[in-house]
Amino acid sequence: MKLNTLQLENYRNYEQVTLDCHPEVNILIGENAQGKTNLLESIYTLALAKSHRTSNDKELIRFKSDYAKIEGELSYRHGTMPLTMFITKKGKQVKVNHLEQSRLTQYIGHLNVVLFAPEDLNIVKGSPQIRRRFIDMELGQISAVYLNDLAQYQRILKQKNNYLKQLQIGQKTDTTMLEVLNQQFAEYALKVTLRREHFIKELETLAQPIHAGITNDRETLTLDYVPSLKLSNYEANQSELIEEVLALLNDNLQREKERGVCLYGPHRDDLSFNVNGMDAQTYGSQGQQRTTALSIKLAEIELMNIEVGEYPILLLDDVLSELDDSRQTHLLSTIQHKVQTFVTTTSVEGIDHEIMNNAKLYRISQGEILK
């Protein structure tokens, strides 16, 4: 999977720009606040129909403009395809091969990306919400079924929370509706939990040898998915598992009514990274946390290739120069001649010479690409 061209109109600080992309490495160089990260963000947004930097799409529209447009031509093993995203202050429109997609779940997955930025250390040391979002963003790109199940779960969760709040303040007294919601909730909570569990096991299998290689076998990395729905046997059949989830929800019905909020489900789950058996969030050094984050990102690249048959595009936002020689070497061995990569940096100093030899350089200044 490659991005051949990227066209922006009224996106962030870009009025109009076209990027003819190198099939291997694209290095965007410039001072801070010139628009390098905005270019990377536009690729991410084109892939996932949302930015990783803001939840407000209006911020993506250039100052004093009415719309923003991102268009990219992709090449796959079997041909090319344009993707388009049109953003206004009223909403957004996405197209695949010039055909408008009525649902984002039909759109996401045509362009797969892996982003590695300084804030990705928060995957290890940040809040559970950050780790859940990481799982959903990566898993959502490779499984349309998961995206749909997650959307259904979130819809039912919102309904359940609204009803619990009404029970808490006395606007409702009948719990029959809650029982109906719990039945639907249990079904989709289980689907989301099981798919996440499977995804983390696959990711761990790929991340372990990468982490061992970076640390010269001094460290062992393990991943543990930590569900709030503690089930006795995940290998049981679907109906038995749903009954177990329902039993747990019923046992805690009074607590949820008193709190006015749903206390169990995938929206409360977490992911633990362990280095040599110790929690990296609590006990890991910054170097160990950085190595863990890099191992996970490189494992994502391989997993996406396994699942969809195409390597994703790698976006490196101001992190390459921060990686030491060992980490850069492992990054290079993963991406070389396989993964199209976009890199932002203020200086090419410290970047591996082999990466530079297979790269195209773009100088970015005040929202323009200098020739």
Curated annotation (Swiss-Prot):
Keyword annotations of the record: ATP-binding, Cytoplasm, DNA damage, DNA repair, DNA replication, DNA-binding, Nucleotide-binding, SOS response
UniProt GO cellular component terms: cytoplasm
Chain positions recorded as ATP binding sites: 30-37
Pfam families linked: SMC_N
First-listed, main subcellular location of the protein, grouped into a coarse class: cytoplasm
GO biological process: DNA replication; DNA synthesis involved in DNA repair; double-strand break repair; SOS response
Record flagged with keyword Protein biosynthesis: no
Localization, UniProt: Cytoplasm
MF terms (GO), sorted A to Z: ATP binding; single-stranded DNA binding
Record's function text: The RecF protein is involved in DNA metabolism; it is required for DNA replication and normal SOS inducibility. RecF binds preferentially to single-stranded, linear DNA. It also seems to bind ATP.
Protein family (similarity comment): Belongs to the RecF family.
UniProt-recorded name of the protein: DNA replication and repair protein RecF
Organism, as annotated: Staphylococcus epidermidis (strain ATCC 35984 / DSM 28319 / BCRC 17069 / CCUG 31568 / BM 3577 / RP62A)
